[in-house]
A protein has these predicted regions:
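Generic hydrophobic transmembrane alpha-helix motif, especially the helices
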Residues: 46, 77-82, 90-91, 96, ...
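Short helix-capping/hinge motifs at transmembrane helix termini and TM-loop junctions
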Residues: 12-20, 90-94, 119-128, 201, ...
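Amphipathic alpha-helical segments that mediate coupling or scaffolding at interfaces
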Residues: 60-63, 67, 88, 122, ...
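Gly/Trp-centered helix-boundary motif
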Residues: 1-83, 87, 95, 109, ...
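Transmembrane alpha-helix boundary and packing residues in multipass membrane permease domains
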Residues: 5, 87, 116-121, 144, ...
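Glycine-rich helix-loop "coupling/hinge" segments at transmembrane-helix boundaries
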Residues: 119-122, 144, 202, 209-248, ...
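Amphipathic cytosolic juxtamembrane alpha-helices at the membrane-cytosol interface
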Residues: 54-69, 93-101, 161-165, 169-197
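Residue-level recognition of transmembrane alpha-helices
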Residues: 2, 59, 101, 117, ...
Length: 259
């Protein structure tokens, strides 16, 4: 299911029947069209349309692009940062290890959403609103990545403590290999399996975090398609009869996260 969604989002221009962000293909006359199986529904809009007359199916496919881009990029950033700190802490030890682990423990007490909100708030205080809107995706990637790295650091450190006492590491030291080469050429490949497991789970959490931030209005700007943004605007019409504007993006997000 995940690869089907990924394929559709990458080739949205081919898969989606409409481009919902092209003014020429959107008409307000089509606004609030219900799904095809409901009274008043049309086959040209299988899942109905939103308040702007945009096809819901096409909008969700285009919106999943941002969620997947932010999810993948933020997890890669968190994995690089966390693995680097975890391996070096486990291999070097001493005060450096204590500092890294205490920092990890402190951050793990803070929920990821709150940490991402904090980083986003700091970014808004430093740069102008216009610049923030232009760099919203990069701010989101950094904010979510900063909130997710401790899990990678703890797993990497624990695995490194086991690996550094094995014979191949001792042999590498004897032949004069540098610590950097030992850590990232010999130890890292042997601890990748648990790291990739954490990354798989973290990707789903990153996508949900991005959608949550966009739903709260602190993620991508309203002009940028995102599943969280779609749910946010559809929420205004949930109890006025146009339930499909929120329902389908929410179901799509759940399926994407679980897949």
């Amino acid at each position: 299911i995940f690869f089907i969604i990924l394929f559709c989002s990458v080739f949205a221009g081919i898969v989606a029947p409409y481009n919902p962000f092209d003014p020429a293909s959107v008409s307000l006359m089509d606004a609030f069209t219900p799904p095809v199986w409901s009274e008043g529904g049309r086959f040209s809009f299988i899942l109905g349309t939103d308040q702007q007359g945009r096809d819901m199916f096409s909008t969700m496919i285009y919106g999943s692009r941002i969620s997947l881009i932010v999810g993948f990029a933020s997890i890669i950033f968190a994995m690089i940062l966390g693995v680097f700190l975890g391996i070096t802490a486990g291999y070097i030890g001493g005060r450096y290890e204590i500092i890294v682990m205490r920092l990890t423990d402190v951050q793990l007490t803070i929920p990821s959403i709150l940490m991402a909100l904090l980083v986003d708030g700091i970014a808004r205080a430093i740069i102008t609103q216009t610049m923030h809107d232009e760099m919203a995706i990069y701010v989101l990637i950094f904010a979510i990545g900063i909130s997710e790295w401790p899990q990678f650091a703890r797993v990497s450190r624990a695995s490194t403590l086991v690996e550094k006492n094995k014979e191949y590491v001792s042999a590498s030291r004897i032949i004069g290999l540098s610590n950097i080469l030992i850590m990232f050429k010999h130890i890292l490949p042997n601890i990748l399996r648990p790291i990739l497991v954490i990354a798989t789970i973290g990707l789903a959490l990153a996508i949900i975090t991005e959608s949550t931030l966009s739903f709260l209005g602190v993620g991508v700007p309203p002009t940028t398609p995102s599943l969280g943004t779609l749910i946010r605007f559809g929420n205004n019409f949930l109890f006025s009869g146009e339930w499909w504007i929120t329902f389908f993006p929410a179901i799509f997000l759940i399926v994407l996260a679980l897949s």
